């Protein structure tokens, strides 16, 4: 795939760490795409909390995965700036702005990617209709079981509830047009 996932992150909770491990495992296993992660915080937590897991799981993955740390003196998380930074570091035809709390069936990703590759559109928000989404709350045991399975997201349906679509951002974009459109607005 000529695709890079752009993932801004701040690892401020156990839940965020678990979410990041989940999506990195899923993306690196299911897709032949690049993944760029940029952590922005006062302290680098990724190297201690995520990297040992990735190294154990995947070995050397430097050809598809890159991590960047942006040290901040405050707790402010400037997501739009991080996305712009990652966009400029990417080198693929298509990028995907990706939150750590979004996970879809594999076909959702491939359909969104293919729609852009086939020049049907320049941007895809790979969501269903309406203002609701599935929200999955799970215990560590469920998390471990999912990561050691075939990563079929439908296996998580039994833990899902329907909730308002207020979290979980994902946006596939043709990189060249994204840059031409002046990227993300960093002023808010």
Residue ranges of model-derived segments:
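Alpha-helical elements of Rossmann-like donor-binding domains used by nucleotide-donor carbohydrate transfer enzymes
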Residues: 22-26, 81, 85, 111-112
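Short beta-strand/loop segment that forms part of the nucleotide-sugar
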Residues: 32-44, 68-72
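Short loop->beta transition adjacent to catalytic acidic/histidine clusters or analogous donor-positioning motifs
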Residues: 2-4, 27-37, 63-65
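Short, charged/polar "capping" segments at the starts of alpha-helices
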Residues: 14-16, 42-50
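Active-site-proximal specificity loops/subdomain of glycosyltransferases
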Residues: 46-89
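Short beta-strand-to-loop acidic/aromatic patch adjacent to the donor-nucleotide binding site
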Residues: 93-103
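N-proximal low-complexity "stem/linker" segments adjacent to membrane-targeting elements
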Residues: 1-26
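Conserved catalytic core of nucleotide-sugar-dependent glycosyltransferases
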Residues: 105-186
